[in-house]
Regions:
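Donor nucleotide-sugar binding/catalytic pocket of nucleotide-sugar-dependent glycosyltransferases
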Residues: 144-181
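Conserved donor-binding/catalytic core segment of Leloir-type glycosyltransferases
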Residues: 185-203, 209-212, 225-226
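Acidic donor-binding loop of glycosyltransferase active sites
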Residues: 261-277, 290
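Conserved acidic donor-binding segment of nucleotide-sugar-dependent glycosyltransferases
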Residues: 306-307, 311-318, 327-333
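Membrane-proximal helix-turn-helix segments that form the acceptor-binding/catalytic region
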Residues: 83-87, 110-112, 132-149
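A charged, aromatic-enriched C-terminal amphipathic alpha-helix characteristic of glycosyltransferases
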Residues: 333-365
Length: 367
């Protein structure tokens, strides 16, 4: 078997943890998972250790970066040590999802351009992302220097091909994220909406809260809104909640084993984002066959269809979101079966694991 070296930033473990096991059927993999000491622990550490125990040809290297400031001399030295370890293996290719400082400028002294693949999670950096200016700077540098890339949406594929001409690019969507079977079910007579995932400004949870308050004042029918995800500034959103009885809040990192029951309680999911390149949360929604109300953005429109398996609104449009939520509440019994059936058809046709993994293998084998 040939060897791959795989380098994953902590924030992208939830993507790679689903693809690595399938690639192990073809390659030996040296997997470096990198996180910073400001985290108490790596969220997926238990799951990663279980994978390493299950597969003999997977060698897991969990790396905690200790430097407190990324622009310090210590951070540069620490990153050089990491890059030296990564390149110590004889490998067919290096695949990396890290595109920031000091990793990118230092990597040119260690990586070979011809056999390094970067995962471009955001060719277009979404509005509201923290450190967006520096992210654009170092990502742009990487995309001009290196040759090989993966994108996770068709719109990002086209953007990369037109912006950075002459690059080798392949598109493979996220593998649907299955965390197990739910043991819960929706509450009888209560239409329940779910927003799931890390709460960030560009995801516009304030829009969801305000729209929910509007719906509360417009109907006497029972409904509930579940908001589940880690947030560092929840006080900025809490202030919009006037009727806490319609909200179920889980403002924390949601352990993987609790995710199925979150979706088991919901009927619909809501993603009113201002901007997005692609969404891991949507992959979980599709996996659990929960129709979405979501923003009219290219990354969403290439996957779902309005009035067929989803309902679209203008990005972060509070009035339209309230209208769609109210429509779902008032017409749930008549619209829901067709929405779910169409969503399950989309899941079968577009997200076969075998087809997705073949895209990775075909690209890697051409290098």
């Amino acid at each position: 078997m040939e060897t791959l070296v795989w380098v994953t930033a902590e924030s992208f473990v939830e993507t790679d943890i689903h693809i690595i096991p399938m690639l192990l059927e073809r390659y030996n993999i040296e997997w470096y998972v990198v996180y910073y000491r400001r985290k108490e622990k790596l969220i997926y550490e238990t799951e990663l250790q279980k994978l390493a125990e299950r597969y003999q040809n997977l060698h897991l290297h969990i790396t905690c970066l200790m430097a407190s400031k990324i622009y310090s001399i210590e951070a540069i030295k620490e990153m050089c040590r990491l890059l030296k370890r990564v390149t110590s293996h004889r490998s067919k290719a290096v695949y990396s999802s890290i595109l920031n400082y000091p990793y990118i400028p230092l990597s040119i002294f260690y990586y070979k351009r011809k056999n390094t693949i970067f995962a471009a999670h955001n060719v277009h950096v979404p509005k509201g992302v923290s450190h967006s200016v520096s992210t654009k700077l170092y990502q742009g540098f990487a995309m001009r220097w290196y040759k090989n890339y993966q994108t996770f949406s068709k719109s990002q594929y086209e953007l990369l091909k037109t912006t950075y001409k002459g690059k080798n690019v392949f598109y493979a969507p996220f593998v649907l994220k299955d965390y197990g079977e739910p043991t819960t079910s929706p509450e009888d007579g209560v239409v329940t909406f779910l927003n799931f995932g890390r709460i960030r400004g560009y995801k516009c949870i304030d829009t969801l809260i305000r729209s929910s308050e509007t719906v509360y004042n417009a109907t006497k029918k029972k409904f509930k809104v579940i908001i589940a995800g880690e947030c560092s500034n929840w006080q900025d959103y809490q202030k919009y909640i006037k009727h806490p009885e319609i909200f179920e809040l889980h403002i924390e990192n949601i352990p993987n084993e609790q995710i199925p029951d979150m979706f088991g309680k919901a009927l619909y999911t809501v993603l009113p984002y201002q901007d997005i390149a692609q969404s891991g949360a949507l992959m979980v929604c599709i996996n659990y066959s929960k129709p979405s109300i979501l923003s009219k953005l290219p990354a969403f429109e290439e996957v779902l269809s309005d009035d067929e398996n989803a309902y679209f609104i203008e990005p972060a449009n509070e009035e339209q979101l309230a209208e769609r939520m109210l429509y779902c509440i008032n017409h749930h019994d008549e619209i829901y079966p067709a929405l779910v059936a169409n969503l399950e058809k989309t899941k079968e046709e577009q997200f076969s694991k075998e087809v997705i993994v073949k895209k990775y293998i075909d690209f890697i084998d051409r290098i």
